[in-house]
Amino acid sequence: MVTIADYKGKVKPDWCPGCGNFAQLSAISGALAELGIEPKDSVITSGIGCSSNMPEFINLYGFHGLHGRLLPVASAIKWANPKLTVIGYGGDGDGFFEGTQHFYHTAKRNVDITYIVSDNQIFGLTTGQASPTTEIGMKTKSTPEGNIEKPLNPLTIALTAGASFVARAFSGDALHLKEVIKKGIQHKGFSFIDVFSPCVTYNKINTYDYFRKKVYKPNTDTKDFSSAYKLAQQWDDKIPIGVLYDVESPAYEDRDSVISGKALVDIPLVKLTPEHLREFL
């Protein structure tokens, strides 16, 4: 029987006390354990940032990659060994700045991975610059007179790109966060989960209290694209969290004749020929 203790890493997290990433670490570990997935059967990939140190803090296979490039790595791992449960994990700066193109195209392909973004609306590792989700008017080290750029909406991007599972959660509601992650992992196809993760050090606006007053769980038809898109645009007074969109759609691995036939990992190395490799190119 798998327990959450099986996922406890040997390295102690170095996040600031109160960081929303702690709740996400617990939620990811709990979700995998409750689904009966063993550490040896799961992988997490990350880029650069405070949240991207996650592979060091959780006991499963991990790949700490380049800034914004965690999704190509996650996709490659899934294609090489479809039996693995693959999670991509990073921050809003990593995923929505350098990683925007990978985010869009991975969603479009509907690769069977779960992508969790720790969205604190700030660059935390570099001590407080505006990120792609920073709100208009917010003063940061890179926007001392206030941010003049409209924040990016990751949910509408995921929906229009073709993601088959789109959700939002809040680190201040750990049990709900865990359940959303469980649903994302169980979903066959690209699962995107944007998590409000307050940065207690560099973002004094989007705090735990800020989100507690605004978030709510709508009773919605998760098969209805129009409804999901409308909810994804709500922000000012009320912000919906939970699964907004969840539909069945063939995953990339099931549509690719080579990957769906025989996984690369199942071909013995002694028999691996240049012809085999060409099939995967």
Map each language-model feature to its residues:
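Conserved thiamine diphosphate
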Residues: T3, K83, S131-G184
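Short coil/turn connectors at secondary-structure junctions
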Residues: E38-S42, A80-V86, K108-I113, S118, ...
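Thiamine diphosphate
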Residues: M1-G124
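Short beta-strand segments
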Residues: T45-G47, Y89-G90, T114-D119, D194-F196, ...
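Flexible, low-complexity linker and terminal segments
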Residues: M1, K10, C199-L281
